[in-house]
Amino acid sequence: MVPIGLDDDLARRRPPIVSAGHTLPSYSLESLTMIDHFALGWVTPILSFLLSCAGCAVGLTCTARARVSHGIASIGWLALGAVSIGGTGIWVMHFVAMLGFHIRGTETRFDVPLTIASGLLAIAVVGLGLFIIRTAGVGPFTLVAGGTVTGLGISAMHYLGMRALHVGVEVTYDIPTVFMSVLVGIVAATAGLWLSAKVHNFAAGVGATIIMGVAVSGMHYTGMAAMRAEVVTGTVIVPDGGVSVAALLGPLIIGVTISTILLLLVVGLAPSAAELEAQEKFKGWQGRQEEIQREAAEPRRRSQLL
């Protein structure tokens, strides 16, 4: 596989590049360490932000219904919220943003098992955070604890996803920037968990969605800013492992489309949070009326016995 995007005048008489048993020309160090996070222009950051907002919006709708549900129904809504926020709002946003990532002179390939594992991790940690808030309440301690656990998990998802990249060069990270990205992730997760427990109307939901989309995107690009690429021993091995972006794009589009349609169907067909709350109030009122009727009937029953 020949490196892409290099002009002939960049070639240098350096040690050869080896790929799948073939000897290829070598290139200058500068051409191989140029990282471009926006190789496709503003398409990927805007699209990834919109997808993040969409996932967070559906997720907030699910968590709102979890608040007014009980038992298995509440757990089910929390699970759907975790899939929406962790899957679409965070992981899909990360992957789509990575479509614009390119190191000049190399081809980006993905380790499929690690890529899938990063998505499952995102869903799991968001689900854990939502469960903590749902069961323990939105106190300062639980909010900080849930936000920290979820933020660390999201950061782990990001760097696991980066570990899944095969780029043919040595990748290192600027430690202070890594810590900054983790901090951003914790703040974003804490804000998201707080919003998941507090959003009650459409206007607040729109604002919360935008805040969460900005926070998730900010964490991703802060983490990407920590990345450094270096040539190993003066040569570059063109990556042969993993699969290409094009090979993953089709399954990703199909998977996201199907899951989004299913989520929207569930959310659309199920009662809204307001309707569920009204049902709970009606059940409470009905129970009180039955109790009043029983109390009113008790004197008559006693008189009949006498």
Report residues per predicted region.
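Peripheral, non-catalytic segments of secretory and membrane proteins
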Residues: 2-10, 18-306
